[in-house]
Amino acid sequence: MTPGDRARTSSEVADALADGRAVVALETAVLTHGVPRDARPRPTTLDPDHEAGRILGDHEWDASAPFNLETVRAIAAGCRRSGAVPAVVGMLDGVLRIGLDDAELERLAVDSSARKLSTRDLGLAAIDGANGGTTVAATMRACRLAAPRTIEVFATGGIGGVHRGWQQRPDVSADLRALATEPVAVVAAGAKVILDVAATLEALDSLGVPVVGFGTDAMPLFTAGVHSELRVPHRVDDASSVASLLRSHWHDLGIASGVLVANPCPEDAAIDST
């Protein structure tokens, strides 16, 4: 089997990349391991009178479908409403799919044996012919394998990082290494709130990864708003400024790291971190 057989880009995503249209990668660890599989009504934070709901627009939530499936469908719909083609990444039958269609999404959503795949797991899962949801790190690798061009923007909820108690047990997510080595812009609501966020920021600094707050000077805390005492190194206030940064970082200066664009969770959807 050739490398091209191990990673396949859907025709929709490939056409968009060939035409130079906007493509946003989406991960599937949230589908396989992040949220419940049973059917549930639409969260109130996705109602049209909330900011997140307005982004999704007229997406009709199917309350009879698995919650994890509808969650990813809603995220993909938000990408389309914003003018981008969503490239949902996941593994089916040992093939890393870049641009899952709805039937493939549904298949992965209901598979209770699906694996959670980081970069270390991809090769073995491919050999095993496994199904799996991709983490931030694995999805960034998939972005680099997309054809005919790489995908430069990836949206997710929050990155992994340095866990609390790292002084006793050095539990550090592979997401940080991926950010240091894969030139992809990761748009996320900062780092997951369960982490040592200050240590995560220090690690990103040591790895040479730019962290920019999108419309904020404070570090976002995933679902919990922002950390009032933890500042981000840089701030941008519009998408064109992000594009200019990426062009300078990658194309003008040839720096081959990722960039973390820290976009806070909408205030009307944030929860108390305590």
Regions inferred by a protein language model and the residue ranges of each:
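N- or domain-start disorder-to-order transition segments that initiate the globular core
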Residues: 1-20
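Generic structural signal for well-ordered, non-membrane alpha-helical segments
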Residues: 6, 10, 40, 64-75, ...
